[in-house]
Amino acid sequence: MNIAKTKIGRRAFIKSTVVAGGGMMLGFSWLAACTSSPKEALKMPKEWFEINGYLKIGENGVVTIVSPNPEIGQNVKTAMPMIVADELDVDWKMVVVEQGPLNTAIFTRQLAGGSQAIRQGWQGLRMAGATARKMLRQAAAQTWQVPLDEITTDSGVVFHKKSGKQAGYGELASAAAQIPVPEEVELKEIKDFKIIGTSKKNVDGLKIVTGKPLFGLDYYKPGMLIAMIAHPPAFGLKLKSVNDATAKSMPGIKDVFTIQTYNNENEKQWSDVSAFNDLVVVVGNSTWEVLNAKKALKLEWEPVDGSAPETSEMHTQLMNESGAKPGRVRRKDGNPESAFKNAAKVIEGTYTAPFLAHNTMEPMNFFADVTAEKAELVGPTQTPEFMEKSISARLGLPLEKIDIQMTRMGGGFGRRLYGHFMVEAAVISQKVKAPVKLIYTREDDMTFGIYRPAYHAYFRAALDAQNNLTAFHVRAGGMRDSSLRANRFPAGSVDNYLAEDWTIDSNITIGAFRAPGSNFMAVAEQSFLDEVAEAAGKDPIAFRLELLNRAKQNPVGENNDYDADRYAGVLELVREKSGWGKEASNLHRGVAAYYCHNSYVANVVDMAIENGKPVIHNVYNAVDCGIVVNPDAAINMIEGGVVDGIGHAMYSELTFKNGEPQQKNFDNYRLIRHSEAPKSIEVHFVKNEIDPTGLGEPPFPPVMGALANALYKATGQRHYHQPFIKNI
C-alpha cells in the first residue's frame, strides 16, 4: 500500500449524513484533496446537490459520484469516477455517475482544456475513494470492536475474516459519516487495481444512441424564448444603422434590439473574447420564427476606424515576408551560424497552414434565465469557472447568485473555451426579463468564430560529410500567434540549435484549436525531419532514434521539455507493430512521432494512390500516456484524433476576402468524409506505471506529419502547404 496524507480541509472534503435516508456523503475537490489545509469536520449543506465533486453512499450500497469537469467527448464523466470507485473498492455496477454544476467555492480547475483533467485529478481522485474506504473500515472496526488492520474490503463489502463478519457499504455508511476524516490513507498498489485499466462503456452511451436529452440544444424550460444574433458580415466592420421594422412585425417576434458585447476593454479576457462589439438580437417564440425575422433585418455596416479588410492573399504575403527575416530568438545552443557555414549539406523547407474553423457538430448555444435576484445558466461550455466572473460583472449580480449547469457538449476542440455566447445569453435574458436560449446557426458559428491561426515555419538543417546532423534552425510564426515550441525535440539532440519566432497582428479572432500550436508544428517538423533523413541516406525511424539517443546520453542544454526515453519508446513500438520495412508493395509509408500535453504518440500511415486519389489503408499508433484508465475510451480518442488530423491536414481551410470568411457551412468547408477515413486504425499502448498524462489532444498532431510523409512516398513530391489535397 502507498500511504498518503490527506491534509483535508473544507475545499477538499465535506462529510456529513445525507438528509434523505441516512448514508454517507463525501464531497471532494479532485485537485484540492492533496493540498495542505487545516482539517475540519463539517455538516453537509442542506442543498447537497450544489456540491461539485462528491461521493455519496446510500443505505442500499449504491454509490453516486458526481463528475465536475465538463464532458466534451473525452470521457472524463466515466474515467474520473472509475478512479474514485477503484480506490473505494466498490463494484462498478453499483456506481451512478452524475454531471456536477459549477461551484467554485468547493472546486478548482473546473474546465475542459489542455488534456489535463485526468492528469491533474489523478491523485485527488484516488484519495477521495481511498478516504471513503478507510472511513468505512473504521466504522466496521468500531462496530465490531476489532482492530482496524484486520478489516478488509472487496467490491463494496467490508469483511472481518477472523469472526466471519461482513457488511455492505450501505449498512456502514451512516456510522462512517460520523468518523473524523483520517489524516492518512492507503492507496492501492497499481497491481491491485480492479477497475482502472479495464474497459468501461461511456456512462452516457445509451442516452446518446437513443437520443435522450443531453446536449445544450436539447435543453428546454417552459416559457423559454429563442434568441439569435446578427453580427457584422466581415472582420473590420461595425454597425452603422438598423432597420428592424419588418422583423418586429413578423409572427412570434417579441423584440429586436442591439447589445454591446463589452462595456469596457477590461472585460476582454481570453475566455470571453468576441470578434465584434455591436450585435443585433432577435427574440421570439420559436427557432423558425426568429430565423426568418433575422433574415428580414436591414442592416448597414461601416469600417472600424483604423481597421483594413484582410484577405488570405495578404496573409500569405505577410507571412512569407516575416518568415524570411530574423525573428525573436527563443533558444540558441552552440554556434549554429558557423555550423551552417561549414556544412557539407544544408536542407531547407518552408511550411504553411491556413486558418481553420472548429466546426463543432453542435453550434454555440446557451440558456439563461436572469432575474433581479439570480441568474441560472445551462449549456455546453469548456470553461464554466472562467465565465462566472464575466457574467457576474455584466449582470451586476454577486458570484453566489450565478448558477451554471453544464450539459454534454457536441464537440469543442477549443471553441467552447471562449464563452462570449454565455455572456450574450445572460445579457439578452436580463434585457427581455424572460428565460432565453441563444442559438447560433452554422453560418453564425463559422463567421462569428474563434479560429485556428494561419501558420508559417521555415526550417534549416546542416549535415557534415558523414551525414551527421550538426545544426538545426527553426523560425516559426503566424497571424497573431506562433507555433514555436523552442524546447521540444529536436532541441537537446544537436549541438548547434536556433529557434526564432514572430507574429503578425490581425483583426481576425484566433484561439485554441485542438493541440494549439502543435497541430501545425508537428506536421512541419516531422515532414522536415523526414527530408533531412533522406538527405542523410538514413531510415526515418533510425534517424529519429539516433537523435533521441544523443538526447538521452549527452543532452544539449537543460531546458528540454521531453523525456527522450519515452519518445524513443513509442517509435520503437510503432516500428514493431507496423512491421516497418515489411510493408506491402502497393502501399507507401510515412512515419511521425510527437510529444505534447505530456504524452508521446508515434504513427505509421500506409497509403496507396487509387484512381488518382490518396487512399489510406492503415494507421498504426503507438501511445505513451502513462497508466491507461479506460482502454476502450482511450482507443476511441486516438481513433478520433487520427481521423480528425488527417481530415484537417488533407482537406480543410478557411479563407478570407475583404475580411469576410468565404466558407460558411459544410457545403464549401471541406471536412473528411467516411469514405476517406482510414480503412484500419491500430492502437498500441506503452505499458508502464507512470501517472496518466494527456490524451484528448496528443493523437491529433503527429498523424498529420505521417500523412505528409506517406504522401511524399506515394507521389514523389514533398507537401509543404496545407490542405494537401490542393497539390495532389
Kindly give the residue locations of the regions a language model identified.
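Cofactor-binding beta-sheet edge motifs in enzyme active sites
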Residues: N2-L26, T35-I728
